From Swiss-Prot, chain A:
Protein name, UniProt field: GATOR2 complex protein WDR24
Pathway it works in: Protein modification; protein ubiquitination
WD-type repeats, residues: 72-112, 118-158, 161-201, 205-245, 249-291, 295-338
UniProt keyword annotation of RNA-binding present: no
Phosphoserine modification, residue list: 155, 470, 496, 594, 598
Biological process annotations from GO: autophagy; cellular response to amino acid starvation; cellular response to nutrient levels; negative regulation of TORC1 signaling; positive regulation of macroautophagy; positive regulation of TOR signaling; positive regulation of TORC1 signaling; protein K6-linked ubiquitination
Length: 790, 303
């Protein structure tokens, strides 16, 4: 992770240059403080007290203030502060309760200046007055705060917090006489330095110790406090009662808090345990840190911004015996990592989308956070480019329908529920499904069904109202009827000699053919014209004489002894294995070289993806001409199914697979079929279409699939008379030879829903038992059992 | 538009298996569940328990009950469970050293397994072993700097289902994809000894990979993964030949901004992509990969 950028900032006169760097200290640091020239930093700890120069590339040790062979406890520092007006003046708080000042201007090696031994216990904090050169404040574990005038030998005044230890003291930057102190009991006190008798104000800021506080460098009256309750709170102290404006939740207790220069809402925090990182928060975004410095390996004990007007350099000291300079630019920014958007496809094809609302939207539309309402000016301020994000973050969550006006996946549900997959002749199934598809506005699917019907149903069996579908708009009953008559006649006329015999003569059949194709073409040309008169009239007149024969070809009237009559395989339920009997392979040979074959092939291929009723009709026409056996289309149908499956319409693939059954099964490899089945069943179950799903499982030809609903279907039944398990199949008990499924209420044999108590084996009609149980909880058979039904 | 009343940015929104409930998670540390049936939006639960921004949520398959997993910046993964209408924390996994960015449940056929990708570079796999116990496996250093996304491959059985008599658990090969800050997409496979091994490294992005999504295998003959990145590009990876396991990328689109999310429709025929422009683009990656529709969330003007 090489991220070594260099930052140079010119701050009126002085220039700050530097990069992220660190140096090893001899001992853990407890506190750091920066000289006002921003070029030196002092590090203090239990056994360290050194001044380092901050150079461009590194820290350079300049001075070790810990002199003498046997350093006294006075040198064991809990805190250190560098005077912001006098470069030579430092103060430390010793763990033995002594407050020491240091004068770097002293010529001797020992720079120690004054010693105040007034506190009884550890001094936690020292603080210089921001503008008054000689005023020093201290806060101690003994519960007292003392104000020293450095020109005098002892304290000027003592402030009693009337409570446990003082954790932090800070002079207000704006109000000359005011300072804040924080306490272990969760209180914050505000004092006037002239009135040591009692505090100006006191309030409970945190639950548990308040470890630190920091006055906002610009905003008069903003005080940030940090506590063991893992919270940082920003208070407005200008109002009569301190008002909580912001609250930031961190993941560990807050040991130090420092406002970031030039960034009004930013503050840096570090923790005294668990968490070693330093965070910079935007108080308006209390949940995600704006930046995070992860360099330290142990608890960070001191943080300080290098220059009061430069937001990019942060210095820190740590228990891991290192001193670091962090560059804001190099910080990891969890906000940047964060996904500002959430996206999810719903089941019905709707999209849920959550996106960050831009600041602009927030400005114009939304109410800002309550805390900001007081400062609407903020929104107009030009945003600091150093800020990693622009103001408030909130998200708008929208749900889109992907198909405007339609219900997304609604078609899937409708189709699944309405498709007929078995139990009727193939042609009817195809017609029904085509109709369903068309009603749902899925024309391509409808066309496919119609095509399948034409391919797989031998022409003689085409029921009426067929072309009705292929033409598209559901015309009059008369015309399509005639059309199909015509087709029926035409195909055999061309296809086989025997059928030719049955027609009235060669010439005659030719005419019919010509006429019918003319009809078809007419139909194509004006597919919208419902029942155009010309062909209808013509056909009526022409075909009249053949009606008897046509009836012979009808499934119902077919003579079994007629060798040429192709029995409707579709009449059988599809799940039965039927030997496919194509109308005769010899026809294929007859016409294999005919130009029609290649033509029709090309046609069909071209229309597989997007077909129109025009091409469809011409294809069907060609098919009848050439009398191709359905086998011929196996490959084509397979490709078609693959096409639908790839489009995500596995429903179509499976439905066709089931409807066509044996006709296509052999063309598609078992694994693919299985995959389609399982995918489709999965989908059906997601849509809670249990019945459809079950039907599909039942109808599936794949063993692996059909065994899906055979898992755990065994019921163990006891005979209601002899109470022994029934071993044989059926409802007659082997032992007592009585029917076990008698209703205990009406004493009839139960057919249909049977409910029984697992305790006493008695039961009966669901209705009867339910009624019985309304009045009594005992078994209706009178066995005395308190029946339980779940 | 759903009013979530989240107090900060929403990072993820996920619909459950039946499309009836929507779970959202936000920087405000909360996870919320809404009933969105019939166009309504009723807040069912407001789950508090994370101590940092919650990045992602994931619904488990309903056959295991109502279970939701969430992962957060606080380095924790929490598994929530509904019992008698109330949602409660059922398990907390604190095995990561950094923010956990992504969670994803394995296909239900494998049992209850959760993959979690974290900024510490590791991916952990939590497997429910019954009685409230979870077994943890960890892939250390899966992605240097961090893992941003995990996505399971659909359950596919080697060979035909037919070889396995009903009732016996078929021998699934478990796989998932992960995307990380090393600009890579990695494919992981469970070895026979139960250890996870890097199977493939897919390299095409020039910046952090933000999201990966393995397409549901409905009707598709090939394995397909969509990935998106900080570099603005969306790739569709396909593996036509499972035996050689070679994957080829196809650039679907190059956006001018970060692409945060990719999401497949349940039939895998449409890919939704959300980018830095705050819009959702839907693409049909097949047959030319043309863009279909662009959705723009309504601005909150006047509300």
């Amino acid at each position: 992770m090489e991220k070594m950028s260099r930052v140079t900032t010119a701050l009126g006169g002085s220039v700050l240059t530097g990069r992220t760097m660190h140096c090893h200290l001899d001992a853990p640091a407890n506190a750091i403080s920066v000289c006002r020239d921003a070029a030196q930093v002092v590090v203090a700890g239990r056994s360290i007290f050194k001044i380092y120069a901050i150079e461009e590339e590194q820290f350079v040790e300049k001075l070790n203030l810990r002199v003498g062979r046997k350093p006294s406890l006075n040198l064991s520092c809990a805190d250190v502060v560098w005077h912001q007006m006098d470069e030579n003046l430092l103060a430390t708080a010793a763990t033995n309760g002594v407050v020491v000042t240091w004068n770097l201007g002293r010529p001797s090696r020992n720079k120690q200046d004054q010693l105040f031994t007034e506190h009884k216990r550890t001094v936690n904090k020292v603080c210089f007055h921001p503008t008054e050169a000689h005023v020093l404040l201290s806060g101690s574990q003994d519960g007292f705060m003392k104000c020293f005038d450095l020109r005098r030998k002892d304290s000027v005044s003592t402030f009693s917090g009337q409570s446990e230890s003082v954790r932090d003291v800070q002079f207000s930057i704006r109000d000359y006489f005011t300072f804040a102190s924080t306490f272990e009991n969760g209180n914050v006190q505000l004092w006037d330095i002239r009135r040591p008798d009692r505090c100006e104000r006191m309030f409970t800021a945190h639950n548990g110790p308040v470890f630190c506080c920091d006055w906002h460098p610009e905003d008069r009256g903003w005080l940030a406090t940090g506590g063991r309750d893992k919270m940082v709170k920003v208070w407005d102290m200008t109002t009569h009662r301190a008002k909580e404006m912001h609250c930031v939740q961190t993941i560990a207790s807050v040991a130090r808090v420092k406002w970031r220069p030039e960034c009004r809402h930013h503050l840096a925090t570090c923790s005294m345990m668990v968490d070693h990182n330093i965070y910079v928060w935007d108080v308006r975004r209390p949940f995600v840190p704006a930046a995070m410095f992860e360099e330290h390996r142990d608890v960070t004990t001191g943080i300080a911004w290098r220059h009061p007007h430069d937001p990019s350099f942060l210095l820190s000291g740590s228990k891991d015996s290192s001193l670091c300079q962090h560059l804001f630019r190099d910080a990891s920014q969890p906000v940047e990592r964060a996904n500002p958007e959430g996206l999810c496809y719903g089941l019905f094809g709707d999209l849920a989308f959550a996106a960050k609302e831009s600041l602009v939207a927030a400005e114009s539309g939304r109410k800002p956070y309550t805390g900001d309402r007081r400062h609407p000016i903020f929104f107009k301020r030009k945003l600091d480019p150093a800020e990693p994000f622009a103001g408030l973050a909130s998200s708008a969550l929208s749900v889109f329908e992907t198909e405007p006006g339609g219900g997304g996946m609604r078609w899937f549900v409708d189709t699944a529920e309405r498709y007929a997959l078995a139990g009727r002749p193939l042609a009817e199934l195809c017609d029904h499904n085509a109709k369903v598809a068309r009603e749902l506005g899925r024309n391509q699917v409808a066309q496919t069904w119609t095509m399948l019907r034409i391919i797989y149903c031998s022409p003689g069996l085409v029921p009426t109202a067929n072309l009705n579908h292929s033409v598209g708009k559901g015309g009059s009953c008369g015309l399509p009827l005639m059309n199909s008559f015509n087709l029926k006649d035409m195909a055999p006329g061309l296809g086989s000699e025997t059928r030719l015999d049955r027609s009235k003569g060669d010439a005659r059949s030719d005419t019919v053919l010509l006429d019918s194709s003319a009809t078809l073409i007419t139909n194509e040309d004006n597919e919208e014209t419902e029942g155009s008169d010309v062909p209808a009239d013509y056909l009526l007149g022409d075909v009249e004489g053949e009606e008897d024969e046509l009836y012979l070809l009808d499934p119902e009237h077919a003579h079994p002894e007629d060798p040429e009559c192709v029995l409707p395989q579709e009449a059988f339920p599809l799940r039965h294995e039927i030997v496919d009997t194509p109308p005769g392979p010899e026809h294929l040979q007859d016409k294999a070289d005919s130009p029609h074959v290649s033509g029709s092939e090309a046609d069909v291929a071209s229309l597989a993806p997007v077909d129109s009723s025009f091409s469809l009709l011409s294809v069907s026409h060609a098919l009848y001409d050439s009398r191709l056996p359905p086998d011929f289309f196996g490959v084509l149908v397979r490709d078609m199914l693959h096409f639908y499956a790839e489009q995500g319409d596995v429903q179509m693939a499976v439905s066709v697979l089931i409807v066509l059954g044996e006709r296509v099964r052999k063309d598609i490899d078992e694994q693919t079929q299985e995959h389609w089945y399982t995918s489709y069943i999965d989908l059906l179950q997601r849509f809670r279409l249990w019945n459809v799903s079950n039907e599909v499982v039942k109808l599936s030809t794949s063993r692996a699939v059909s065994c899906l609903n055979q898992a755990s279907t065994t019921l163990h039944v006891n005979c209601s008379h002899c109470k022994r398990p029934m071993s044989s199949r059926g409802w007659v008990c082997d032992r007592c030879h009585r029917c076990a499924s008698m209703c205990a209420v009406c004493h009839h044999v139960v057919k249909g829903l049977f409910v029984w108590c697992q305790g006493c084996s008695h039961g009966g009609h669901l209705q009867h038992i339910m009624k019985w149980l309304e009045g009594s909880s005992h078994c209706p058979a009178g066995c005395g059992h308190l029946c339980e039904y779940s | 538009t759903v009013d979530t009343s989240h107090e900060d940015m929403i990072h993820d929104a996920q619909m459950d298996y039946y499309g009836t409930r929507l779970a959202t998670c936000s920087s405000d540390r909360s996870v919320k569940i809404f009933d969105v049936r019939n166009g309504g939006q009723i807040l069912i639960a407001d789950l508090r328990g994370h101590e940092g921004p919650v990045w992602q949520v994931a619904w488990a398959h309903p056959m295991y009950g109502n279970i939701l997993a969430s992962c957060s910046y606080d380095r924790k993964v929490i598994i929530w469970r509904e019992e008698n209408g109330t949602w409660e924390k059922s398990h907390e996994h604190a095995g990561h050293d950094s923010s956990v960015n992504s969670v994803c449940w394995a296909p239900h056929d494998y049992g209850l397994i959760l993959a979690c990708g974290s900024s510490d570079g590791a991916i952990s796999l939590l497997t429910y072993t019954g009685e409230g116990q979870w077994e943890v496996k960890k892939i250390n250093n899966a992605h240097t700097i961090g893992c941003n996304a995990v996505s399971w491959a659909p359950a596919v059985v080697p060979g035909s289902l037919i070889d396995h008599p009903s009732g016996q658990k078929p021998n699934y090969i478990k796989r998932f994809a992960s995307g990380g800050c090393d600009n890579l997409i990695k494919l992981w496979k469970e070895e026979e000894d139960g250890q996870w091994k890097e199977e493939q490294k897919l390299e095409a992005h020039s910046d952090w990979v933000r999201d990966v999504a393995w397409a549901p295998s409905i009707g598709l003959p090939t394995s397909t993964i969509a990935s998106c990145s900080q570099d603005g590009r969306v790739f569709i990876w396909t593996c036509d030949d499972a035996s050689s396991n070679t994957w080829s990328p196809k650039l679907l689109h190059k956006f001018n901004d970060v692409v945060w999310h990719v999401s497949w429709s349940i039939t895998a025929n449409i890919l939704a992509v959300s980018g830095g422009d705050n819009k959702v683009h839907t693409h049909s990656p097949w047959h030319g990969g043309h863009s279909l529709l662009v959705f723009t969330p309504p601005t909150r003007e006047g509300t």
